[in-house]
Amino acid sequence: MATPPQRIVSLTPHLTELLFDIGAGDRVVATDDASDFPPEVAPLPRVANYRSINLEALLAQNPDLVVAWRSAQSRMLAPVEKLGIPVFYSEPTDFASLADEMRSLGRLLGTLQKADQQADAYLARLDALTQRYGKPKPVSVFYQLWYPPLTSVNDSTWPGRAIKLCGGRNIMADANTPYPQVGLEQVIKANPGLILAGSRDPAVLAHWRQWSMLDAVKQQRLVLINPDELHRFTPRALNAVEQLCEAIEQAGTIKSR
């Protein structure tokens, strides 16, 4: 692009947040229904949700760049690309690759110095967490993504990678799909020492208390993780990763006694 874009429409929460992180937040003119951080996004027009894009509302913003999540939104944006509007697609594959995306956005938007600073700080913290918590621990972990139906994650997902980074063993690590539906008997057989859920509501884990034979229940290791931090591809994810690592480390301390 000859000049850095000045009117950006962001269609996914993690990109909205990254734009502010790298110093381009003042150019965001519209976003999606789920973007709620930082607080400055509150008054912005909303032109999409996780299922669809309001093309008319998007075009009304006269954007010179649209940023989107490739795996979830590329098909929906075909009409936008046909109109010649540039689209930046995000698809971080692991924690380290997020820094590359920050730099790519910074290069595109003319804020590379700020993006480099943020990416370097993020990688330094990621390395510190890996050094502190990365040693494998004798802790089996079940991550409850949703209930009901009982749904978990394999190791290719953001939460799955976090469990691995923290040295835990995800009991659904090798599932054939990223977000497998799980039978209760599978969890009981695996007998995890820690059960996690991406939620702020303690009620989402209450159903486990009836299964008192589970190590996680015996040890009161039913832990909530902030979903807006862990499930979004941003530097804030490391706040949740650190919380997750602490939970695994504490469970490992009990296990090794």
Predicted segments with their positions:
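Short secondary-structure boundary segments
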Residues: T12, R70, L145, A175, ...
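A ligand-binding cleft/hinge motif common to bilobed small-molecule-binding domains
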Residues: A72-K82, L194-L214
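A short, structured surface patch at a secondary-structure boundary
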Residues: R7-Q61, L65-S74, I171
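Extracytoplasmic substrate-binding proteins
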Residues: R7, D64-L65, R75-T151, R169-D174, ...
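Short, low-complexity disordered leader/linker segments with a strong preference
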Residues: M1-P4
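Short, structured coil segments at secondary-structure junctions
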Residues: A24, P43, K82-G84, C166, ...
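His/Asp/Glu-enriched short active-site or ligand-binding loop at hydrolase and phosphoryl-transfer sites
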Residues: D32, S156-Y179, S199, V223-L224
